[in-house]
Amino acid sequence: MASWVLSECGLRPLPRVYPKPRTGHPLLNSNPTKLRFSRTDLGNGSSFCLSSGILREKNWALRVSAPLRVLQVEEEEENKEGERVINGGEEFDPGAPPPFKLSDIREAIPKHCWVKDPWRSMGYVVRDVAVVFGLAAVAAYFNNWVVWPLYWFAQSTMFWALFVLGHDCGHGSFSNDPKLNSVVGHILHSSILVPYHGWRISHRTHHQNHGHVENDESWHPLSEKIYKNLDTATKKLRFTLPFPLLAYPIYLWSRSPGKQGSHFHPDSDLFVPNEKKDVITSTVCWTAMLALLVGLSFVIGPVQLLKLYGIPYLGNVMWLDLVTYLHHHGHEDKLPWYRGKEWSYLRGGLTTLDRDYGWINNIHHDIGTHVIHHLFPQIPHYHLIEATEAAKPVLGKYYREPKKSAPLPFHLLGDLTRSLKRDHYVSDVGDVVYYQTDPQLTGAEKS
């Protein structure tokens, strides 16, 4: 898709050449004299108001929503091509433009799925925080090596659940109150050493450009040129377990290969000037949490702190890397990545994957319902299952039913291992590309 017309969040495809990300609200970079938007209500609680290019109220919610309209001519051309693939009896091509529009998916989702209930959202926060402190109290009380491994798994999962709730605050799906979202988001994310605004802004870039080779932000593919310029040690670390599952803290400080910037520094390429204060606020909160942990180590001892917090923190990082990677990689069929005019918000979003985590689904707030979340991030997590079921008839083969999990999702480790062995880089040329394999890294035949 060449361009998108938005009436809520100003979402646009970023330029093909992206040396310095422009991650602020795209409308702020336009001619201010040409911007005269009034408040609009989309029926899902999201609204904003611009006049002469100046926001009338500050909203810390992650300003990413699905585009409401696309150019009709391009839309019709893509629909016809997709219909030929699906209805013409040919083998399904996941890279073909879909025979439906984003609005078709939206219309299939019940209206109540868009409603945000702050009391219900806060209920999940209270539940998770209570479980976190309860687990820590039980582990500290028994303090034996039968309990500790069980505690580490359970607590790392709960830390990850806290991250997901903070993630919802960043999207604005937690509530319609931006101040409530910001306060709760800072508390939850700072408690697990995540800079709330810094991450929120980069995650916005990810959603705005999902499925784009260069412009996507997290777990995007390496181009062949960048990949071949990596030294052997870096390649091994990136594609050999468990190292990819420990990447998140490094990503916060230095991002992915081929990109520069830090989630902590207000002058990073990730941010635009009007976001500096938010980034500084989050970095201060992160520093305060780190200072609190240092002080706590003098009270209970560094070994006890490592057992109560340090190991669960690392487990949380592994959960985060596992889940976020597998929502965009690891399907048994190779899925496309896009560039240039072949990329569109809809086509990029349809490359995402749902995953089943068994008993963990409810604990981490159904984050596995990822396709609809990526297309419509303003839907609260507690409505995503219903919204997904309603959208499936429209999505057809573009929705890939996740493999049913056992109580614990050990099967996903197989998907992860397979992907790390085969998904190494994409071609430097072409607007629809697929992962290729480096035979020198794995000993496999090049694909």
From Swiss-Prot:
UniProt cross-references to InterPro entries, sorted A to Z: FA_desaturase_dom (IPR005804), FAS_N (IPR021863), Fatty_acid_desaturase (IPR012171)
A Gene Ontology biological process term: unsaturated fatty acid biosynthetic process
Family under the similarity heading: Belongs to the fatty acid desaturase type 1 family.
Organism for this UniProt entry: Sesamum indicum
Xref: PANTHER family: OMEGA-6 FATTY ACID DESATURASE, CHLOROPLASTIC (PTHR32100)
Enzyme class: oxidoreductase
Protein name (Swiss-Prot/TrEMBL): Omega-3 fatty acid desaturase, chloroplastic
Annotated gene: FAD7
Enzyme Commission numbers on file: 1.14.19.-
UniProt pathway annotation: Lipid metabolism; polyunsaturated fatty acid biosynthesis
Keyword entries, A-Z: Chloroplast, Fatty acid biosynthesis, Fatty acid metabolism, Lipid biosynthesis, Lipid metabolism, Membrane, Oxidoreductase, Plastid, Transit peptide
Motif (Histidine box-2): 203-207
Membrane topology: Peripheral membrane protein
Entries under Pfam families matching the protein: DUF3474 (PF11960), FA_desaturase (PF00487)
UniProt motif Histidine box-3: location: 370-374
A single Gene Ontology CC term: chloroplast membrane
Motif (Histidine box-1): 167-171
GO molecular function: oxidoreductase activity, acting on paired donors, with oxidation of a pair of donors resulting in the reduction of molecular oxygen to two molecules of water
Record's subcellular location: Plastid, Chloroplast membrane
Function comment: Chloroplast omega-3 fatty acid desaturase introduces the third double bond in the biosynthesis of 16:3 and 18:3 fatty acids, important constituents of plant membranes. It is thought to use ferredoxin as an electron donor and to act on fatty acids esterified to galactolipids, sulfolipids and phosphatidylglycerol.
Entry's free-text remark on domains: The histidine box domains may contain the active site and/or be involved in metal ion binding.
